[in-house]
């Protein structure tokens, strides 16, 4: 968009002859220099000059020069990544520029578009649309095209005609060019196709997308990133038209699911959005979200492509994806082609945790109450800490300040979130353990809690290094000697909550037969620990495990006694009880459908379901799937064969609600994968 001529502004800045001695002659030069740098997008040079002009007492607040300086300064702040400050600056000057006449119209339109994009980035639909429509109405001819595309994509989930009208006008502009640009025509047909799909017009949407594909050269053996995205759109359209074979063909041609090792399943943080009033999502809602992964493993862009609901629902799914994260070393293994744009199918989850409560929560809560005031000087908004980099920064700041207590606490909270290399993460844990074990460093209860939490995370980190994903049941049979030894520590033994937590964390979820009696004895001591209240969550956790074990052995009267001791209803047990261990599932070659295998697809599905008291599962559905819609049904069919340990429930209710398991579909020595070809420079 062309910049605004500055004649109207400059006339207000040039001093009159009678003022020549009062005003430095460099003011006009500063303005000209700043504007010239802004025109050529050299904001590193322009911003300091605009800052100086904004502070200059000769620039009258509320004047047109002040407004122009504020808007251009704000534009530079946006370009330099300072979104909040940039938005404030633009909003402070824009009202005056809006009334300054036609000379400033292009600049006002540019500012409106910038504000619209900021609103889109924070999922503010109505504010974004208001700014974009204002910009559109200020522009004429082909200058409207880029704004029309933004409006079309923003309103794709709204229903009505706004999105389709914007796409139709954009297409008309592109077709009216003396030499129509095929790339632009492809973009407009694609936009129209997506909008139609999201309005439930699958047949019409597929027709528009097919037109885009034809203009782009058809289905070939090679695919650019643009081609891959277009083919994924057509796969979506074919699936919505119940053309499964066509969907497989287009999805295969996009390269999705044919990367070789299905790397996206290895995310360190990957949660679907919750169902319920906070998100507005219901179990029947679904979406496909396209996202990109930065070098540090964070998602730096996430946008909904398809949803069967409104903009609010579509973006609720995209917001969830925006918080996903991969370890940097895992992200580096994903080919750049797929890191730039990949898609997943999403449904909301009814799980608020990982299925079954962890016995660590009461100890964690106790530590939080003591520790959070120590952290406040380093990060007052603790609730807004969302990842390991912030905890690491707090730990390092506390270490630099010689604040050992705060450093130990920060490293304790850092440990389970740490996405650095395992050796680095373990070094941080060991350093914190050394500090926490030193006499008189922490109050006894805080020392006990940090030592137990750090030791538990240390074991989990070491086990991740063992790469034993192929036999998850094996790890469920292994106790943690380090935690069981901590339970016998003289200081921890005087702290019932800490000691019992260490025992429960240290016991195997599914002990080997030779260790079962010892595990039962440990559980009984925790279940009957009179140092804790009768219905303390730690005692309830142990009592439920004992009830389950007794029921599996046919000791139903004993199981009833332990269950009654919890004081819980069976519905409460399904939410907070220990998660049953998986005992078997048919995950052999027969579970991989041939009609999918022959295309060379590999992928994964995170399934969610309830585990019944008899170990069978019910209510199976997919919550995340890659590639979209390919493996969702096979994963659900496979999980119907899963069996878990039985659990005691007097009325046979659920043993564990909203449990989640990831099902991987892999082809050994798969030769039907895509090859990434680097463009010659």
How would you name each of these model-derived features?
Residues 21-157, 161-165, 169-681:
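Charge-biased low-complexity segments
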Residues 1-19:
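Gram-negative bacterial Sec-dependent N-terminal signal peptides
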């Amino acid at each position: 968009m062309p910049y605004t001529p500055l004649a109207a502004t400059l006339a207000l800045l040039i001093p009159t002859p009678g003022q020549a001695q009062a005003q430095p002659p460099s003011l006009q030069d500063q303005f000209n220099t700043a504007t010239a740098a802004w025109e050529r997008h050299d904001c590193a040079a322009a911003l300091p000059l605009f800052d100086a002009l904004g502070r200059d007492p000769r620039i009258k607040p509320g004047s047109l020069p002040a407004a122009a300086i504020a808007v251009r300064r704000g534009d530079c702040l946006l370009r330099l990544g300072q979104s909040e400050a940039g938005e404030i600056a633009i909003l402070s000057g824009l009202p005056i520029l809006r009334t300054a006449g036609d000379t400033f119209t292009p600049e006002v339109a540019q500012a409106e578009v910038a504000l619209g994009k900021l609103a889109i980035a924070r999922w503010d639909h109505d504010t974004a649309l208001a700014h974009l429509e204002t910009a559109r109405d200020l522009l004429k001819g082909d200058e409207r095209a880029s704004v029309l595309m933004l409006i079309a994509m923003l309103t794709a989930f709204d229903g009505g005609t706004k999105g389709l009208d914007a796409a139709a006008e954009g297409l008309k502009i592109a077709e009216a060019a003396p030499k129509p640009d095929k790339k632009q025509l492809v973009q407009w047909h694609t936009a129209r196709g997506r909008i139609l799909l999201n309005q439930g017009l699958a047949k019409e949407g597929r027709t528009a997308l097919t037109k885009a594909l034809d203009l782009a050269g058809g289905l070939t053996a090679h695919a650019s990133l643009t081609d891959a995205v277009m083919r994924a759109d057509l796969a979506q359209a074919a699936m919505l038209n119940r053309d499964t074979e066509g969907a497989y063909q287009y999805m295969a041609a996009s390269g999705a699911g044919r990367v070789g090792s299905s790397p996206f399943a290895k995310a360190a943080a990957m949660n679907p959005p919750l169902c319920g009033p906070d998100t507005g999502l219901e179990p029947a809602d679904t979406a496909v979200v396209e996202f990109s992964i930065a070098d540090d493993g964070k998602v730096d862009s996430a946008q909904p492509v398809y949803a069967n609901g409104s903009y609010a629902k579509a973006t609720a799914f995209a917001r969830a994806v925006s918080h996903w994260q991969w370890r940097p070393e895992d992200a580096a293994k994903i080919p750049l082609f797929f890191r730039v744009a990949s898609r997943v199918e999403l449904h909301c989850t009814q799980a608020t945790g990982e299925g079954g409560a962890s016995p660590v929560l009461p100890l964690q809560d106790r530590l939080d109450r003591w520790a959070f005031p120590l952290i406040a000087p380093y990060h007052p908004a603790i609730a807004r800490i969302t990842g390991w980099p912030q905890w690491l920064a707090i730990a390092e700041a506390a270490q630099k300040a010689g604040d050992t207590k705060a450093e130990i606490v920060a490293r304790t909270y850092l440990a389970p979130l740490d996405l650095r290399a395992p050796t680095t993460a373990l070094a941080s844990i060991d350093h914190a353990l050394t500090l926490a074990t030193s006499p008189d460093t922490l109050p006894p209860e805080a020392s006990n809690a940090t030592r137990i939490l750090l030791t538990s995370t240390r074991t989990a980190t070491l086990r991740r290094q063992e790469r034993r994903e192929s036999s998850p049941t094996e790890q469920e049979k292994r106790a943690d000697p380090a935690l069981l030894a901590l339970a016998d520590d003289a200081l921890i033994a005087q702290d019932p909550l800490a000691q019992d937590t260490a025992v429960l964390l240290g016991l195997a979820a599914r002990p080997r037969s030779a260790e079962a009696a010892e595990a039962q004895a440990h559980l009984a001591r925790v279940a009957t620990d009179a140092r804790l209240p009768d219905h303390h969550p730690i005692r309830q956790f142990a009592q439920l495990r004992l009830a389950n074990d007794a029921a599996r052995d046919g000791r139903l009267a004993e199981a009833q006694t332990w269950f009654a001791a919890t004081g819980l209803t069976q519905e409460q047990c399904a939410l907070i009880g220990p998660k049953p261990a998986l005992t078997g599932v048919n995950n052999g070659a027969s579970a991989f459908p041939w009609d999918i295998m022959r295309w060379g697809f590999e992928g994964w599905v995170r399934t969610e379901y309830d585990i019944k008291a008899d170990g069978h599962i019910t209510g199976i559905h997919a919550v995340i799937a890659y590639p979209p819609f390919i493996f969702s049904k096979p994963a659900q069919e496979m999980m119907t064969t899963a069996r878990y340990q039985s659990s005691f429930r007097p009325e046979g209710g659920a043993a564990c609600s909203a449990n989640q398991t990831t099902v991987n579909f892999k082809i050994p020595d798969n030769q039907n994968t895509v090859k990434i070809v680097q463009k010659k420079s």
